[in-house]
């Protein structure tokens, strides 16, 4: 990044912070703080091992220093400003989840547009929240748009604060369905002297597979026999014979199938359940970044600060507002709206931000400031002289 661009961005970040306050987390005085300044050259330097006391007045610190990126620790410490991790005195840590579009299946960073990435990531976020709220019954959650290509979720329930890395890895494995065994989704029940094996329908992965089984059975009933048979044979391990057995079980004992009885149709239904379980775990998982969640000392972006790689706001989102949240509109800083600037670029592309489509071509362009800041922060443009 050249000097003119760097100084311009630092100055405008400072203007933003003079009118906006970062959103401090609970127990802010127990957290470690870090930031990346606007240093010359291509590299970056993280300044960390700071306490809230070291920063002084937070609003003044941000207005004066205008950091490129700002972070706080998921952990709480006895002495957060100590210069080594061993001296800090770890107390507890939030359970943090990171979703990044780069890690989503089907997303190619070189081919998928930024709006498409964010849309895919939001769907993954909704799946993650289903796990956290429905399966784990967490209720102290904070959802944050990262300002880049994804979302963070901070869980602060008392029950998670003292979990070690291995326990947190178990949560990751559950959400990502790692080593999930179909047999673990089935329980044995006794009724009037007989036993049967049924899917666990009270929640979790068993309930998801059970729901998929009911939907699949309903779809088959709406087809003629030949189409239903062909649909079943698309699944691994189901040939014509097993397909006939499954359809017969659906016809003879639909109630048992709807109850999740995996023995209602013998090996055919059991094979169907296994195939549906594989399909459900492939589509319903949330591809969270495992190292972020398992790290009990992780630094994570501070809400209401600016992301130095996009110029967008790291935005906390009320749970009730999540469906309507549009990061391309709602994370654009008001400070960068309403004026135009001149930039130089070598790219030919369209930027979709703040409800506008801004086209830039190689050479000098006059663009809305929010679009110019976005391109400069990403390294795709340089600040041009205004005259």
Swiss-Prot record:
Protein name: DNA primase small subunit PriS
Active-site residues from the entry: 98, 100, 289
Function: Catalytic subunit of DNA primase, an RNA polymerase that catalyzes the synthesis of short RNA molecules used as primers for DNA polymerase during DNA replication. The small subunit contains the primase catalytic core and has DNA synthesis activity on its own. Binding to the large subunit stabilizes and modulates the activity, increasing the rate of DNA synthesis while decreasing the length of the DNA fragments, and conferring RNA synthesis capability. The DNA polymerase activity may enable DNA primase to also catalyze primer extension after primer synthesis. May also play a role in DNA repair.
Gene Ontology biological process terms from the UniProt entry: DNA replication, synthesis of primer
Keywords on record: DNA replication, DNA-directed RNA polymerase, Magnesium, Manganese, Metal-binding, Nucleotidyltransferase, Primosome, Transcription, Transferase
Family matches, as Pfam families: DNA_primase_S
Superkingdom as given in the UniProt entry: Archaea
E.C. number: 2.7.7.-
Lineage per the UniProt record: Archaea, Methanobacteriati, Methanobacteriota, Stenosarchaea group, Halobacteria
SUPFAM superfamilies (UniProt xref): Prim-pol domain
Cofactor(s) for this UniProt protein: Mg(2+); Mn(2+)
Gene Ontology annotations for the cellular component aspect, listed alphabetically: DNA-directed RNA polymerase complex; primosome complex
Complex formation: Heterodimer of a small subunit (PriS) and a large subunit (PriL).
CDD domains in UniProt: AE_Prim_S
Record family assignment: Belongs to the eukaryotic-type primase small subunit family.
Any GO MF annotation of the entry: DNA-directed RNA polymerase activity
